[in-house]
Each structure stands twice: as C-alpha cells, then as structure tokens.
Amino acid sequence: TRSYGVTGVQTCALPILERQWVAFAANGSVLPRKSGVSELPMTGSVPFTAPDSMTETVELPHRGKVTGMAVPEGITLIVGGGYHGKSTFLEALQNGVYNHIGGDGRELVITDNTAVKLRAEDGRSVRNVDISMFINDLPNGRDTTCFSTMDASGSTSQAAGVVESMEAGTRLLLIDEDTSATNFMVRDALMQRVISREKEPITPFIERMRALYEQAGISTILVAGSSGAFFYEADRVIQMDRYHVVDITEKVRNICGQNACGQHVMEQVQTAAFEMPVFDRKSPAAGHKREVTDTGRERGGRRGRHGSGAADRPRTMKVKIMGKEMLMLDKENVDLRYTEQLADSEQTMALAYFMRYLLEKAKSAQTVRESVSEIETLFEKKGWQAFCSGYVPCGLARPRTQEIYAVLNRYRG
C-alpha cells in the first residue's frame, strides 16, 4: 500500500500557513504536462517565474531557501487570453495538495491541503444540504435549507459543492469558469434589470465570495475569461501572458475605479446577509439495511434436520472500482468523475473500503461529520486492517478528508 504523504505536504506547507498564504509556486517549476493523459512534464515549456510584486522566499526542510510566488489569502483572479496557461496553472494548484515524485516539475507547487476544486456536476445526487445561501424561494416552494435531489442541475450541484466543501473544512476553493454553471457564478447588470432579483432564486457565487472569506475564512482562486464582474471583488488579479505570470492588480483597480485601499468606487449590488449552515445532517450511510446471508443449508445441514442451525449473518458487501472515476458497492455505483483531486485508482479503492465499513457498521443517528471522523480515527489507530475483511490487498492509497466527504455526498443508496 502507499499513501499520498499528507504529513509531507503539511511539513512543506507550514511556512505557507504561518504567513497566511493559500499557495506557493517555486520559480523554475514546470507546470504543463506532456499530454492530457500523461503526468510527465512537457519538454521545452516555459519555466514558472513569479512576478516581482508576489515574490517571496521560504525555507523548506531538505531544500533550504526557495523563491517563488506566494498567493495570499482572499480572492485571487487568474485571467488571460485563451491558451495562455490559466487552466494549466489552476490544475497545478489543485494537485499541489499532494507530494510529487522527483522530476515531476511541480514538486514545489504547494497548495493549502484542504483546497477543493469545485465545478458543476449535472445529474449528481444531493442529500439534505443547506443551499439557502445560494438558492432560495423556489417556484414550487421547496425548502432549500435541507435540499435533496437525485438529478441536480449544474447550478444546484455547484451550490451544494460549496456547502459540502465548507462542511469538509476547506480553506480554499479552486474554480475554473469554463467548468462552472454560468448562472451560478454571475448575473450581469442587464440580466438583473430584465429579470428582477425577486424573480431569480439563485444568488450567484460572485455575491457570496467576499462573505465566504470574511465570515468563514474560505479563500477563492478563480480562473475567469468571459465576465469582468469578478474584477470588482478580487483582492489580487494575475494575468497569464504566454505562460508568464503578470500581476495586474493595480491596473485592474484603476480601470474599475477602485482606490488604493481596494474599496469600490462604483456602486455594488447589495446582497442580503446569510446565516452559516449548521452541519448536522444525517450521514447517507447511517441506518443502511444490510442484506442477510442464510447460513443454514437446504439439505444435509442441521437446519435440514429441523435443528436450529447457525444464525443468519449479514453479508459482506462486494466492492469494485472502474479506474479512479467510479466505485461499486454491490450494485450501487458512485460516480467520482468530477472529483478532480483524486490522484489514482488506489485512492478510489480505499474510498470503496471506507464506504463499505460505514454502510455495514455506521450508527443509525450518525452525522456526515461523525462518519468521516470515525473513519479517520479508526485508520490512525488500526490502519487498513480495520476496513479489509480477512486480508489487506495491495494497491491502496489514503485519500484526503475532502475526498471521503465527496464519496459520502455522492452515494445514492
């Protein structure tokens, strides 16, 4: 078995957390990959270089002093023309929660290890999630403080994803506008005049991102390419220009009419305040009814001779994975295609064993947080043996806390 070295990442990330940064990328890092199906670095690519205004030096164990770009807490916008490296940079950041093999090129791209890559997931299930900070006053009168659906729209799935990430303890959201639901992210001024706020149940993410940081301590790094509205909310704006990083924060402030303190001169939409969700929802694994195996034999056994026979016992669930994107628990599929920070199928197999344990042994009144806490506490005490019946198979890698939440949230059973 192998683990993805959360402790190692935490050791490297310690100076980052102490300085209130959410990410760090060392000069000389190679961010592009050889191809879309390869983890090898692209040969001949432009090495990463930090802009002077964001250059910092940290001292790391076994590395000494390392210079690169520090991304501070708050709201950071990544912009630039198509094919200039915006999504490549974000992908490097989303994988910066893990240690990298030497020669990967991204060994010193380090991200807050609670970071969650967020995207729209049309068709996913949502169970008992309080999405009222984003969606309210539905035409059918449905309660959005405890919302469930087996077929979420893009905007609903992304709203649920934010709240589930908060429940999982994230300190950083990573979002690419290209893979997001447009109506969840932003509503321009003209649309707001045509369709009044009273007729629109969705409060877009742009109107909550500041409060998420100031009230919940959750920063955002957002790749944007089509809407300039995000400029008004950003603390820092970086431009990818032919794979080079340029800090254009002051330029954007001047264009948007902000003063030197970052205060908006232009009038902004006033959004109603919201209450932080209470994370006490019941775990989908709680109260799961297990199938029972009849241990008595039809003929020749004690039961066949009218004896009492052995007691019936619960049947162990079968687990199976299909690559890193799907796992099966008996006949129930859990779709993890859009859980983008899963590194490989070994983590998916570990998630399958964790889910089987919860479905077979979870307490009926257990909350989602209690379920995840039980898994992690048991793993620390007993390791893989606690989750594997009989023997521990090869090919297991420990997933992060955030991915354990993700598989629980996507279980439909």
Locations of regions flagged by a protein language model:
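Single conserved hydrophobic/aromatic residue that forms the stacking wall/gate
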Residues: 1-12
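N-terminal pre-Walker A segment at the start of P-loop NTPase domains
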Residues: 34-67
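Glycine-rich phosphate-binding P-loop
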Residues: 67-95
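AAA+/P-loop NTPase substrate/partner-engagement loops
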Residues: 96-135
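Flexible beta-alpha connector loops of hexameric P-loop NTPases
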Residues: 124, 134-155, 187-202
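Conserved alpha-helical scaffold flanking the Walker A/P-loop in AAA+ ATPase domains
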Residues: 153-165
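Conserved P-loop NTPase nucleotide-binding/switch module
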Residues: 165-209, 213-214, 223-253
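Conserved NTP phosphate-binding and transfer environment spanning the P-loop NTPase/kinase superfamily
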Residues: 211-217, 223-413
